[in-house]
Amino acid sequence: MICYSLGNFCFGGNKNPADKNTAIYQQSFTLINGELQPGIDAQIIPCTLSSVSSYNDFRPTVASGEKAQEICNLMNTYSQNCSNIEIDGLGKLHVN
């Protein structure tokens, strides 16, 4: 998994970006007796950069319903040629 630009989740560089879709990446690691266990326990939390669609109010909002599904689908489309990971409708990452 490659995550890009985690430090710029919301910034004032664009007052109304055409694409307000974004996501929070969440990774969990399991240690047993100090040993890292194999497997991926990761998800994305689909979000929008703004709480309104007409302009950027700089209030990131967790997406839900159809918007969340749309963001997950876009992430799958962006990743299909370079990854064996698929994101389900709830944001959970699965290795194919």
At which residue positions do the language-model features occur?
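Conserved beta-sheet core of the metallophosphoesterase superfamily
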Residues: M1-Y25
